[in-house]
Amino acid sequence: MYIDFDGMQTKNLPNFKGGEKVFKADMFDDGDTKIMRGILESGASIGLHTHEGNCEIIYILSGNGKVKYDDTEERLSAGSCHYCPKGHSHSLINDSEEDLVFFAVVPELR
């Protein structure tokens, strides 16, 4: 299945999951899996949240930032991949001067 992120209406999600500023997302959701291209501008973040019935894979396309994962902190840059398994918590933070652009997949686990 082809997914055209450029042809999608971008969703602007302010203070997403309790984060700072606006999370911009081009998102495909078939009810079982969310597949998205996301953008966090400088100083923006996705707030700390727990994946109860799903997991998340984040691949950084461009920019730099960090993930708070459970009790640790991880630096991310273009080419980095972060995995948050079911039952774990994380947040994504753009602490750089440029946009943080990423690809993410969130499959529901049954």
What feature does the model see in each segment?
Residues 72-86:
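Short acidic-glycine-tyrosine-enriched beta hairpin
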Residues 45-47, 66, 82, 86-92:
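Histidine-centered metal-chelating micro-motifs
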Residues 36-51:
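Conserved short histidine dyad/triad with adjacent acidic residue
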Residues 53-65:
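Glycine- and acidic-residue-biased ligand/ion/polar-headgroup-sensing regions
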Residues 86-110:
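Ligand-binding loop in jelly-roll beta-barrel domains
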Residues 42, 53, 72, 88-89, ...:
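A generic "binding-loop/recognition-motif" signal
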Residues 37, 57, 72-74:
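Short, surface-exposed secondary-structure edge patches
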Residues 1-32, 47:
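A short, N-terminal "cap"/entry segment at the start of jelly-roll beta-barrel domains
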